[in-house]
């Protein structure tokens, strides 16, 4: 069977033609495992593709035929996340409420704790902790701890739940960008920054990932590199003792980064606090 033949399942899925999908699977049951050849579609499986397109009927059929429910290759995310990010609520509900037990490696909850925390699904986060207290240390596929994404996305209640359960406030993301939860929050999440600082996050911690473009950055420098121009975070960090003279691995201060990027709001705060 050639590549063109294996790819026929994808347009059938996208159009919602269940008869065609069923016929193709009867001819070759292994089609549930093929990958899309177009890199712009992230080499998705048919189930990831169906979830992203909101085709609930196709999702059901593919799962019935043995599709892997919690597919998580190194260049993409599981079907439930494709559905969530494309705002297909009924498909998300199917994965999380009807077949969560089919999602391997998720404590029978349908999604890993890291991604539940990323989405703000606090009840699922709580259930993970109840079923596996060590899940607060689980790593996502980019090396993130469960604290990284809720810190980035300003989900303060989830941050508190994780910290109360023993999550490491100084955990480094180890596979992609680097940085601790405070670095991630410092991009644009003032409420998360406030909670992390109140809970003891080191305000002058460093991004330790040597091959990251953010290597050596403190949370303040990280804040000064982001297009959000979030001066509220700048104030919080400085008031907590952030070193405005600190430089990153390239020898640049927060002020230097703001000038390069035209971040006038952050620059104004830095200058008001004596940056030069």
What positions do the PLM features span?
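Ankyrin-repeat-protein effector appendages
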Residues: 2-8, 108, 199, 240, ...
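Intrinsically disordered, low-complexity regulatory segments in ankyrin-centric signaling systems
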Residues: 1-28, 33, 37, 41-44, ...
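Ankyrin-repeat boundary/"N-cap" motif
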Residues: 3-9, 35-46, 72-78, 105-113, ...
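Ankyrin repeat domain, specifically the short helix-to-loop turn at the C-terminus of the second helix
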Residues: 25-31, 60-68, 94-101, 127-134, ...
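A generic tandem-repeat structural signature
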Residues: 66-118
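Ankyrin repeat A-helix N-terminal signature
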Residues: 11-16, 49-55, 82-88, 115-121, ...
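Solenoidal tandem-repeat scaffolds enriched in leucines and small polar residues
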Residues: 102, 110-124, 131-132, 140-144, ...
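Conserved ankyrin/ankyrin-like repeat signature
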Residues: 20, 57-58, 90-91, 124, ...
């Amino acid at each position: 069977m050639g590549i063109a033949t294996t790819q026929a399942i994808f347009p059938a899925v996208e159009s919602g033609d269940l008869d065609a999908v069923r016929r193709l699977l009867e001819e070759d049951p292994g089609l549930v495992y093929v990958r899309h050849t177009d890199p712009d579609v992230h080499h998705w499986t048919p189930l990831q593709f169906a979830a992203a397109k909101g085709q609930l009927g196709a999702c059901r059929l593919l799962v019935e035929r043995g599709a892997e429910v919690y597919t998580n290759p190194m260049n993409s995310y599981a079907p439930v996340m494709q559905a969530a990010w494309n705002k297909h609520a009924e498909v998300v509900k199917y994965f999380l409420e009807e077949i969560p037990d089919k999602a391997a490696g998720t404590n029978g909850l349908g999604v890993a704790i890291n991604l539940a925390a990323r989405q703000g699904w606090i009840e699922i986060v709580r259930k993970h902790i109840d079923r596996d207290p060590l899940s607060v240390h689980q790593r996502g596929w980019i090396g993130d701890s469960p604290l990284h994404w809720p810190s980035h996305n300003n989900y303060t209640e989830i941050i508190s739940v994780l910290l109360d359960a023993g999550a490491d406030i100084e955990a480094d993301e180890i596979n992609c960008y680097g940085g601790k939860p405070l670095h991630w929050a410092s991009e644009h999440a003032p409420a998360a920054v406030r909670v992390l600082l109140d809970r003891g996050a080191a305000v002058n911690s460093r991004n330790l990932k040597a091959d990251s473009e953010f290597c050596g950055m403190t949370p303040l420098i990280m804040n000064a590199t982001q297009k959000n121009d979030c001066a509220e975070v700048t104030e919080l960090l400085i008031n907590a003792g952030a070193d405005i003279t600190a430089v990153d691995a390239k020898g640049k201060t927060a002020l230097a980064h703001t000038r390069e990027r035209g971040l006038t709001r952050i620059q104004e705060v830095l200058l008001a606090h004596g940056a030069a």
